[in-house]
Regions:
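Extracytoplasmic gate region of multi-pass secondary transporters
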Residues: 23-28, 155, 220-275, 336, ...
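Helix-to-loop junctions at the C-terminal end of transmembrane segments
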Residues: 55-67, 271-283
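C-terminal ends and interior cores of transmembrane alpha-helices
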Residues: 77-97, 294-313
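Hydrophobic core of transmembrane alpha-helices in multi-pass small-molecule transporters
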Residues: 81, 96-119, 230, 316-334
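Helix-loop-helix hairpin linking two adjacent transmembrane segments in secondary transporters
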Residues: 147-196
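C-terminal transmembrane helical hairpin of 12-TM major facilitator-type secondary transporters
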Residues: 263-266, 273, 280-342
Length: 425
């Protein structure tokens, strides 16, 4: 049954690992508990995204060969990384300002959990496309939507746990979640299976197979896919990382939590909606052109109206800013869900897990550059002023939009001129 063997295990895996995006819920609590600045602790999240992409790139061949081994590795490393993070938070609470505690969190949350993220993200994708051959976009969108929706589902639960578990709630929460997510992922691992009768194409070696597959098209086309994927993630992370402060700038600080949940739903909806829509199109690259067009138009409107810098609380400007946030979140999610199916249309299903894994290295580098780029711009341009009772830099946030608009335009050019249309294989 394609739902039991494909869709449900994919959701169990992705709804677990997708909670990595709940980082902002507890990052300040970790920093306060172990006695370090929030900036120092933030690197754990950047490392997690980096190793997500790199582990997907390096373990793509393993996923291609044995999804049961890769999904088991994902279950163990993700849960172990969570439990290890809890341990080093506990250690830091007993030994404030301990470098060992900080480095332990980097290794546990960043490296070990990052391996679980990459292998867990990749493991069910090809299997879903094999089960849903006529609706590959809908199938992968459903699973990847689970990754995006995980934040909306888990954030209120984590917030309640932090307050309800009393003293030391931050490290207790990680212990509990490690157990819960291991059970979910292990069940997903047990029931995940490719369709009966599917035989992997034989190649002389893993690398030879990937290289030969990529050579079936001009390499410029693959470079274009990689770069536009990278740019979409970089711009998405840059804007999403400043989302909370942008919302406060337009006078909606009290509703920041609700807006964050709605934006997470747009993220998940974009993953499902754009990929399902792409099933009806001749060329899935059209979806990326649509994503980049919507992103450019929404950022330009906010820039031209100075919607963030104008803090007067104009209702129309507030609508423009909220539309920008929701559109960017939807496009960010849609970019992820369409990559595996776009690659399968160009290169076939033979080495799709390995090629998808290599392409996810773009996520690794975007995880390091997106947030950091936005932070650098906000820190070094404009100035912090009192806005609705909080210190914010409206001009800095506007400048982030200027840079992302330019990058979105570059991505549009890549999509139009470098990524060639292909008939589906």
């Amino acid at each position: 049954n394609k739902w039991i063997r494909g869709a449900i295990p994919a959701l169990l895996l992705h709804c677990s690992i997708g909670t990595v995006y709940c980082w902002s819920i507890f990052s300040q609590e970790i920093a306060d508990y172990i006695g370090f600045s929030k900036g120092a602790v933030e690197w754990a999240f950047s490392f997690a995204i980096f190793f997500l992409g790199m582990s997907a790139a390096f373990f793509g061949g393993l996923v291609e060969k044995n999804i049961h081994k890769s999904s088991l590795i994902a279950s163990i490393t993700f849960a172990l990384g969570m439990a290890g993070t809890g341990f080093f938070i506990w250690y830091g609470g007993n030994n404030p300002h301990s470098v060992l505690s900080l480095v332990g969190i980097y290794i546990s949350y960043g490296f070990i959990m990052g391996i679980g993220l990459g292998t867990g993200y990749l493991s069910p994708v090809k299997t879903l496309m094999l089960w849903f051959k006529d609706k590959k976009g809908l199938a992968t969108g459903l699973a990847v939507a689970g990754f995006g929706a995980a934040k909306a589902i888990a954030s209120p639960i984590m917030s309640r746990m932090l307050t309800g578990l009393g003293e030391g709630g931050i490290f207790k929460m990680f212990y509990i979640l490690a157990c819960v997510y291991f059970v979910m992922m292990f069940i997903g691992h047990l029931i995940l299976a490719k369709p009966e009768g599917w035989v992997e194409p034989q190649t002389k070696s893993k690398n030879e197979g990937i290289i030969a597959t990529l050579k079936t098209e001009p390499i410029a086309s693959y470079i274009g896919i990689w770069l536009m994927f990278y740019i979409n993630i970089t711009c998405g992370l840059a804007i999403i990382s400043q989302e909370k402060m942008i919302v406060k700038c337009v006078g909606l600080g009290a509703a920041a939590g609700i807006i964050s949940t709605i934006s997470a739903l747009f993220n998940a909806g974009g993953r499902l909606g754009f990929s399902a829509w792409a099933d009806k199109l001749k060329d899935r690259n059209t979806i990326y052109k649509l994503i980049f067009t919507l992103s450019i138009v929404s950022t330009l409107i906010v820039l031209l109206t100075k919607g963030i810098a104008n803090v007067a609380g104009n209702t129309v400007l507030i609508v423009f800013v909220l539309a920008l946030i929701f559109i960017v979140n939807a496009g960010y999610g849609g970019g992820f869900s369409n990559v595996p199916t776009l690659l399968s249309d160009h290169y076939g299903m033979g080495n799709i897990s390995a090629i998808h894994g290599i392409t996810l290295s773009a996520w690794a580098f975007a995880g390091l550059t997106g947030n950091q780029m936005a932070s650098f711009i906000v820190k070094h341009t404009g100035s912090f002023i009192d806005v609705h009772g909080v210190q914010a830099n409206p001009v800095g946030y506007q400048n982030v939009l200027i840079v992302t608009t330019i990058l979105y335009a570059v991505a549009m050019c890549l999509s139009c001129f470098l990524v060639r249309p292909m008939s589906k294989k």
